[in-house]
Amino acid sequence: MNKLFTQIAWVEYLYWQIENKLILKRINELIKDIERNGNSGIGKPEALKHELAGFWSRRITDEHRLIYAIEGKSINIISCRGHY
């Protein structure tokens, strides 16, 4: 699957490369699991509602979430830092 990051999500991903390699590793594990299992698997996948309907969330840590949508053969990542 292609991994497409929004500009903000890419900046957040680069932030983790500098600030915390363990969180970066967890993000990469979640992305690999999304490729394998879609909207099920590790990180407690949760369908989002309201203005984020159509997107899914997975726990990176208690504080941070990976927010994404699967569209065809692409994973569209809109956030990997903070909480929706």
Regions found by a protein language model. Name each.
Residues 2-4, 8-25, 29, 42, ...:
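Enriched for short, Lys/Arg-rich terminal
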